[in-house]
Amino acid sequence: GGCRRYHPGPHQYTDDQMRRRIQKLKWKLKRMGGVDIVVTHAPPYGLGDGDDPAHWGFESLVELLDTYHPQYLVHGHVHIRYGARERVRDYNGTTLINATERYTFEIPDRPVDGKQLGQVIYKTRQKREDPLERHC
């Protein structure tokens, strides 16, 4: 998650930092046979991003699309009301969805050769145990 660094603050990354974050997933992606759905905060560069630094997308996400060819990439950050942008577009067989504000879509349940269905390979947040709850 996160967006392009445009001023000091949390959850902002340079493109090199985002590329390293994606690289950390390389072996998991290989072991799992790829990825079907990618969910990000910011869009890929040139594919639904904005003209100002605060809304630029990541080139490293374009590289991810070109390498792994997921079925979907769902992003936010660039609101539709900021200008005439497509909510849904295609990039080399990947459906890109700008899900800002809200967007409902259905994903067909179908097997894909070489991929294991129903497995999560990366979780960013886990519930932390409250030490006070253990002693109640």
Which residue ranges define each predicted feature?
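Binuclear metal-dependent phosphoesterase catalytic core
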Residues: 63-68, 72, 81-136
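Conserved catalytic scaffold of divalent metal-dependent phosphoesterases
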Residues: 1-56, 60, 125
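Short glycine-rich loop/turn motifs that provide flexible caps or phosphate-binding loops at active sites
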Residues: 1, 75, 92
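Short, hydrophobic beta-strand segments that form beta-sheet elements in well-ordered domains
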Residues: 38, 73-75
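Catalytic metal-binding/acid-base residues of hydrolase active sites
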Residues: 4-5, 43-45, 77-81, 102
